[in-house]
Amino acid sequence: MTDTLTIVRPDDWHLHLRDGDALADVVGDTARQFGRAIIMPNLKPPVTTTAQARAYRERILAALPAGTQFEPLMTLYLTDNTSPEVIREARASGFIHGVKLYPAGATTNSDAGVTDLRRCAKTLEAMQEVGMPLLVHGEVTDPTVDIFDREAVFIDTVMLPLRRDFPALKVVFEHITTKHAAEYVRDAEGPVGATITAHHLLYNRNALFVGGIRPHYYCLPVLKRETHRLALVAAATSGHPRFFLGTDSAPHAKGVKEHACGCAGCYTALHAMELYAEAFEDANALDKLEGFASLHGPDFYGLPRNAGTLTLTRSQWQLPAEVPFGEQTLVPLRGGEMLRWKSV
């Protein structure tokens, strides 16, 4: 039995940091474990220009704890009106590493998202031309489609036409949750990758209803059946270079999670690598964690691997029940419970 695991310092390829006082409270959790992170642009207002991304990046760097080595990899929010010129400027910046596709209304702060991807054809052509990755929230928002089917329908109605029309466009299918998505990414032609969250590796949709409604397990895309969880575990632990770590850690104040109309998102930045270690250990695949967490992501994005390391030890510890979040608190996933791995 392995009691200590040292890996190349990992990166988080899907992260929400928020802004203001909340940003200052959460960014240190990520920077403690990860060398870099892809920063989601769904602020209010959304980050749609290079100038906005530069300003947000500066706020992130200013909020880091003293002595921290961490690089925020910025993204832009794709809208119906994003122009090819915006893409070229972003690529030339050197600090913007992707453009995020949110179907309008799909998740938190996605109201300004794309209503019809066909409106973005010239912009997608520019992205393909300059090598700018498209980061996709892969769910349709048609209210007639069952919420548990929205990812599979997205593959058929959006992803397949997108790949046909822009075969050289680098696409990241973010936070995949289904067997369909795992198989699609594994078998697709061209530059396609996928991030997988710790919570989708560890839990199925039953976790939402154990003894009552469990709002801190509510995220989008929602947790799926056990057959889908097992398929995600198989993909993550396969060693296939198209699958890599993306926490989708999404902090929300306790009051808006424990609410009649609660927000979607699980906060895992505080204990991300500990959760992934549990998932990989449960699958008897700790030897595959380094590739998934530290190697596949930078290789896909064409970035150098980190020079440092992260060590995890087998050690029981209790996760805080709540942590500060601006003027309020937030509840991390499994808050107050025991974990069996600890990053040092």
From Swiss-Prot:
Pfam families listed in its UniProt record: Amidohydro_1 (PF01979)
Keywords noted in UniProt: Hydrolase, Metal-binding, Pyrimidine biosynthesis, Zinc
Record GO terms (molecular function): dihydroorotase activity; zinc ion binding
Positions of the catalytic residues: 248
Residues reported in the UniProt entry to bind Zn(2+) 2: 100, 137, 175
Catalytic activity: (S)-dihydroorotate + H2O = N-carbamoyl-L-aspartate + H(+)
Cofactor requirements of the protein: Zn(2+)
Record's cofactor remark: Binds 2 Zn(2+) ions per subunit.
Modified residues (N6-carboxylysine): 100
Residues where substrate binds: 16-18, 42, 137, 220, 252, 264
UniProt enzyme class: hydrolase
EC number: 3.5.2.3
Annotated metabolic or biological route of this protein: Pyrimidine metabolism; UMP biosynthesis via de novo pathway; (S)-dihydroorotate from bicarbonate: step 3/3
Superkingdom field: Bacteria
Residues that bind Zn(2+) 1: 14, 16, 100, 248
BP GO annotations: 'de novo' pyrimidine nucleobase biosynthetic process; 'de novo' UMP biosynthetic process
Cellular component, GO, one term: cytosol
PROSITE patterns the record matches: DIHYDROOROTASE_1 (PS00482), DIHYDROOROTASE_2 (PS00483)
PANTHER family: DIHYDROOROTASE
Family under the similarity heading: Belongs to the metallo-dependent hydrolases superfamily. DHOase family. Class II DHOase subfamily.
Function in brief: Catalyzes the reversible cyclization of carbamoyl aspartate to dihydroorotate.
Entries under HAMAP family matching the protein: PyrC_classII
Subunit composition and interactions: Homodimer.
Name of this protein: Dihydroorotase
Lineage, uppermost ranks: Bacteria, Pseudomonadati, Pseudomonadota, Betaproteobacteria, Burkholderiales
Gene name per UniProt: pyrC
